[in-house]
Amino acid sequence: MRKVIIRDKRKIPPFNEPARDLRVLNKPLWLHQKDTLEPYCQSEIEVDFFEQIPNGDHEETLVYRDNLFFDQAFIQTFLSRARSLGKACRVAFALDDLVMTRHALPLQSGIRREGDVYVANMWYYPRGLEEMCRPLVIDTGAYEFGSYHVPTHMSNEKGDLVFQIPLRAFLSIENWVHIFVANCLFGVLAEGARLERSLSKVSNQLKIFWRSLLERRQILSCSH
C-alpha cells in the first residue's frame, strides 16, 4: 500500500514550526507517523493539495494530512475495517464520542461535522482515488480517567473532573494545546489505559501469576 501525505505548512505558535516537526512522544510527528504506518505502507508521496495526488496505477492508497496524530491501535482498527469493507472510506467519528467532543474538537478545524458524523482528513482507497468516499465511524474507546479529586461542592453541576482517554487515539494538531493532549492524554495516559484494560482480563492475570511463580517473585516484581 502507498501512503500519500498532504503537507500542512501552517506554523504552530509559539513554536513557529509546522505540526509535523513538533515532538510527540519524544520524536517528531512525521517520524511517529512513519513508524506507525511502517507495517502497512511500502511507498510514499508528498503533495501540497489533494488534487495533486497521482492516480494512474489504481493501487491501494492511504491519504492523510501531516498534522495528524494517530496511534497503532487506531490505524490498525481503521485499516482492517476499511479493507474488509473493500470500498473507499474516510475516517469519521460519532457525534457522541466523548474523546472527540471533550479533547479533540476545540481549537481546530481539521475534524468537522458533516451530517450526523465528524469527519477527518484521512482517506483509504482500495483501488486508487475515487469520487465516492463513505465515512467509516471509528470508536475511540473512551476510558474515563480522573487525575485528582475535586471537592463535591466544586463539581456538583457538571460532575467529577475527569479526562476521557482514548484506547484508539486520533487528533488534528493545530494549536499548542494539542501538543499537550497528544503527549499526555492521547499518548502516555492512553498507553496506560490500554495496559489497565488488558490487566482486567482473566487470561492476562493468569499469565502474570504463572510468570511470578516461575520466577519466584512477587506479582508486581515479575518480568511480565
Task: Specify the residue positions occupied by each region the protein language model found.
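Extended charged low-complexity segments that act as oligomerization/scaffolding linkers
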Residues: 50-52, 66, 97-99
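Left-handed beta-helix
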Residues: 5, 53-60, 68-70, 74-75, ...
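Noncatalytic linker/hinge segments flanking ATPase motor cores
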Residues: 45, 101-111, 208-215
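N-terminal glycine-rich phosphate-binding loop and ensuing alpha1 helix
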Residues: 1-55, 75-76, 80
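Conserved core of the sugar-phosphate nucleotidyltransferase
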Residues: 58, 70-165
